[in-house]
Design a protein with these regions (language model features):
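Alpha-helical solenoid repeat scaffolds of the TPR/TPR-like class and their adjacent stem/linker regions
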Residues: 1-171
Length: 172
């Protein structure tokens, strides 16, 4: 796809982008889920995802970390964190594995609207990496993004999603 070609061109121009870090997780009884993005505030991306983040954080089986590409906050961020999610800044260096807190799953709220999240997405920072529909198009990064979460409301019933997504598309 065109997005895959664009992302590979970025990787050729900036080889450190395609960093494959060894994903090590603690054998914890709680599944650690990280959410990376820039719109954990009053924004359409937060309206699509913040309720899900809040719901997961309220469950005993999950530990939730929000990685934030901005330093902006408002009442929506406070509401999202209200059930126990942890809030961390996104580090651009990608050099420290501890930045991602050894999450089991890393979910990108959107890609393509802020450089910081897109830079992270080029690297394998967690055993499973997912792109959510905050900006509903493929990442073009099949080597580092495993799944694209779509919706029956976004896709035609019998559409072959593998033609449009570099990732494995999953209907939510």
């Amino acid at each position: 796809s065109l997005m895959t070609q664009i992302q590979r061109a970025y990787q050729r121009a900036h080889p450190p982008l395609k960093k494959q870090l060894v994903a090590t997780t603690t054998k914890n009884k709680r599944l650690r889920v990280g959410f990376a993005g820039a719109y954990w505030k009053r924004h359409s991306v937060c309206k699509l995802l913040c309720g899900i983040v809040r719901g997961l954080a309220s469950l005993d089986d999950f530990e939730v970390v929000l990685f934030d590409a901005t330093e902006e906050s408002d009442d929506w961020l406070a509401w999202t964190l209200g059930t126990g999610a942890t809030h961390r800044p996104m580090d651009m260096t990608l050099s420290s594995r501890t930045q991602v807190q050894d999450v089991d799953i890393l979910v990108y709220a959107e890609l393509g609207m802020r450089a910081r999240a897109l830079t992270w997405a080029h690297a394998r920072l967690a055993p499973v990496q997912v792109l959510f529909w905050g900006h509903p198009h493929t990442s073009g990064l099949p080597d580092s993004i495993d799944y694209f979460v779509s919706s029956d409301g976004f896709e035609a019933p019998n559409d072959d999603l593998s033609r449009r997504y570099a990732e494995q598309a999953v209907r939510f």
